[in-house]
Curated annotation (Swiss-Prot):
GO-annotated molecular function: ATP binding; proline-tRNA ligase activity
Enzyme class, first EC level, given as a word: ligase
Compartments, as annotated in UniProt: Cytoplasm
InterPro entries to which the protein is assigned, alphabetical: aa-tRNA-synt_IIb, aa-tRNA-synth_II, aa-tRNA-synth_II/BPL/LPL, Anticodon-bd, Anticodon-bd_dom_sf, Pro-tRNA-ligase_IIa, Pro-tRNA-ligase_IIa_arc-type, Pro-tRNA_ligase_II_C
Similarity comment text for this entry: Belongs to the class-II aminoacyl-tRNA synthetase family. ProS type 3 subfamily.
NCBIfam families linked to this entry: proS_fam_I
Pfam families, per database record: HGTP_anticodon, ProRS-C_1, tRNA-synt_2b
Domain comment as written in the entry: Consists of three domains: the N-terminal catalytic domain, the anticodon-binding domain and the C-terminal extension.
Subunit structure: Homodimer.
EC number: 6.1.1.15
SUPFAM superfamilies linked: C-terminal domain of ProRS, Class II aaRS ABD-related, Class II aaRS and biotin synthetases
Protein name per UniProt: Proline--tRNA ligase
Length: 478
């Protein structure tokens, strides 16, 4: 791959660009011989590490990390009928131990409610045990029958963060839902990914939930990608799995629950929204390397330049930055290309003239040039990286704003969707009208109670029947 210096497909051909960038930037290898299972390259896995490190830091404020088994006994998995109805066609079953048939089939977790909640029933006895707030980051398996796509639609989700909480009352669980939404906002702000939050219609909520709040991002082709969900589970699962507590008056009460999930789709959105025709563009907070130093070595001062580059690397690393020094025997231009496609936010070029001037050329991933003072390298570099983050966030915000619109007619909705936009319409919340919107516009009714800084959510007449309606998000989805 080191000698592969051909141009990427243009990003306007998003599907081709996406598939190529995963390979060329060393994110994922798609050649594993099982459909829907992919291999992380070390470079891509480092990006994943920094993304999930930030997510862990947010969750650790009031959750405890744990780990539950991958295998779920059939009798536990089948307890919650409504929940199972949503997953039964996607389950992988383990039926043998070696050559011996198992007495009880074991499901590979598609999600972990039915693994975790029998244990909650053992852990919860008194109101003093509540609330419980745990999370795990694990792999999950779903027999995906649609076309698979790396990081977006998988048979093995390698990086599924699922949070599960238990509360004394429905209202306390609702407060937890809002807390998870706030956490999600902070997480995606760190990734410079604008999000749209909405309440999924009842027919599209998580199986067994009272309601589902979903988080969507608008991809470069105008399709929406669901990159997070928060579910208020009410007491459905606690009733099924007998999760009860004794209140202060000595009475037995059913608990109320929430669950919350983010998968590696967050990295798909990160790659897709920020990248350009040259490759990845990574926010400094999650870049494998935040800075690459390219020494320009000429003639007799070769050793002087390398020594100065090494000192610069040490100075920046001592300031907490992730830095790589590229001393390979390649032309500078080949090195520039190598690191551009991999999205390193800042390149520092250091040659003989720079040693004389006490400065180094600084080039951002998007091509802006300035200089840093070698005597003040850490402070100057950190300032540039802050500016890079702000610029990436602003550009992504403009993309989202330009791909959102409000329309009041079905013709207007068709035009918006065909232009690669996501539309806000008014809908009365009647299922028949919802089905009509989806069928006529060949789209998905994403949700009501729209929360976005990029568009105003108002009330108005339903786009189908004219009855009073609420702002509703409509788009084409992955």
């Amino acid at each position: 791959m080191e000698t592969d210096t051909g141009a990427l497909p243009k990003k306007q051909d998003f599907s081709e660009w996406y598939n190529e960038i995963l390979w060329r930037a060393e994110i994922m290898d798609v050649r594993y011989p099982v459909k829907g299972l992919y291999v992380w390259f070390p470079y891509g896995f480092a990006i994943r590490k920094f993304v999930y490190q930030h997510l862990r830091e947010l969750l650790d404020r009031d959750h405890k990390e744990t780990l539950f088994p991958l295998l779920i006994p059939e009798q536990e998995f089948m307890k919650e009928a409504e929940h199972i109805k949503g997953f039964e066609d996607e389950v992988y079953w383990v039926t043998h131990g070696g050559t011996t048939p198992l007495e009880v089939k074991l499901a590979l977790r598609p999600t972990s409610e039915t693994a975790i909640y029998p244990m909650f029933a053992l852990w919860v006895r008194s109101h003093a045990d509540l609330p419980i707030k745990i999370y795990q980051i694990v792999n999950t398996f779903r027999y995906e029958t649609k076309q698979t796509r790396p990081l977006i639609r998988l048979r093995e989700i390698t990086s599924f963060m699922e949070s599960h909480t238990v509360h004394a009352t429905w209202d306390e669980a609702e407060i937890q839902v809002e807390s998870e939404i706030a956490l999600t906002r902070e997480f995606y702000r760190n990734l410079c990914i604008p999000i749209i939050i909405s309440k999924r219609p009842d027919w599209d909520k998580f199986p067994g939930a009272d309601y589902t709040i979903a988080v969507d991002a608008i991809m470069p082709n105008g399709k929406t990608l669901q990159i997070g969900t928060v579910h208020h589970l009410g007491n459905h699962f606690s009733r099924t799995f007998n999760i009860q507590y004794e209140d202060k008056n000595g009475e037995q009460k059913e608990a109320y629950q929430t669950c919350y999930g983010i998968s590696e789709r967050c990295i798909a959105a990160l790659i897709s929204l920020h990248g350009d025709d040259k490759g990845l563009i990574l926010p400094p907070t999650v870049a494998t390397f935040q800075v690459v130093i390219v020494p320009i070595t000429i003639g007799k001062r070769h050793e002087d330049v390398l020594a100065a580059a090494g000192k610069l690397k040490n100075d920046l690393e001592n300031a907490g930055l992730r830095v790589t020094l590229d001393t390979r025997d390649l032309r500078p231009g080949a090195k520039y290309y190598w690191w551009e496609i991999r999205g390193v936010p800042l390149r520092l070029e250091l040659g003989p003239r720079d040693l004389d001037s006490g400065k180094a050329m600084a080039v951002t991933r998007t091509g802006e040039k300035t200089t840093i003072c070698l005597a003040n390298a850490a402070e100057d570099t950190t300032s540039i990286l802050t500016g890079i983050t702000d610029a990436i966030r602003a550009k992504a915000g403009e993309h989202t704003k330009s791909h959102l619109c409000t329309t009041h007619t079905m013709d207007g909705l068709d035009i918006a969707l065909n232009e690669g936009k996501v539309a806000v319409v008014h809908w009365c919340r009647d299922r028949t009208c919802g089905d009509t919107i989806e069928e006529k516009a060949n789209s998905s009714l994403l949700g009501t109670e729209v929360r976005s800084e990029y568009i105003e959510a108002t009330d108005g007449p339903c786009i189908i029947c004219g009855k009073p309606g609420k702002a509703t998000l409509v788009g084409r989805t992955y």
